[in-house]
Amino acid sequence: MPKPDIHPTWYPDAKVICNGEVVMTTGSTQPEIHVDVWSGNHPFFTGTQKILDTEGRVDRFMKKYGMGQKKSGDKAKAEAKADAKS
């Protein structure tokens, strides 16, 4: 026989809340579940793509490793010759 009063309360109609509105109901041990992202607003499921570069990380990377800059001098000439051969 299982021990009485050791199991949590089961809520068969627990509300899942995202941005202040109920998006679905499910069974849970909590009456309300607050989430930030769900399938209705996640870019993978909605088909939209958002690229946020708020801190300029890509630009900082390009500057740090010298990508995107024009090549000059002997290296540029050597690479031009290599490209011409292929």
Curated annotation (Swiss-Prot):
Binds the 23S rRNA. Part of the 50S ribosomal subunit. Belongs to the bacterial ribosomal protein bL31 family. Type A subfamily. This is Large ribosomal subunit protein bL31. It comes from the Bacteria. GO terms for molecular function: rRNA binding; structural constituent of ribosome. Coiled coil: none annotated. One of its GO terms (cellular component) is ribosome. Pfam families: Ribosomal_L31. PANTHER family: 50S RIBOSOMAL PROTEIN L31, CHLOROPLASTIC, LARGE RIBOSOMAL SUBUNIT PROTEIN BL31C. Keywords: Ribonucleoprotein, Ribosomal protein, RNA-binding, rRNA-binding. The keyword Ribonucleoprotein applies. InterPro entries: Ribosomal_bL28/bL31-like_sf, Ribosomal_bL31, Ribosomal_bL31_A, Ribosomal_bL31_sf. GO terms for biological process: translation.
